[in-house]
């Protein structure tokens, strides 16, 4: 049986309700963004069972909504080439998590039924096939909303 990990970007995300329920998983705090994910997870076996819990933004869902993610891919606004889409385990929600290298504040180009984060597609692209994800909508692609959410 492969090891089970709870992967979050920040220590604060360890206190989200779903994360608190996952005490049987080994916690890994990666830091925010793709480069930090790569550094933190590069030595894990690719058959590791990963649950990614964290914050996301979305123009499609209300702040406070809890989302089980079915798909993830990189977000490259203005780039028109085919991106790999990764299907995650444990969800049939139809929700896609778009992973960006920057905080996204413009909802233009964000498809319906989508959320935006800064880590998930990197985890999936790294070859971790036993990955599932639960995201908390912290903002509607608004930096002030996000910062207010973190203060709660």
Which residues make up each language-model segment?
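Extreme N-terminal starter segment of soluble prokaryotic enzymes
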Residues: 1-6
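Gly/serine-rich nucleotide phosphate-binding loop at the start of the catalytic core
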Residues: 7-12
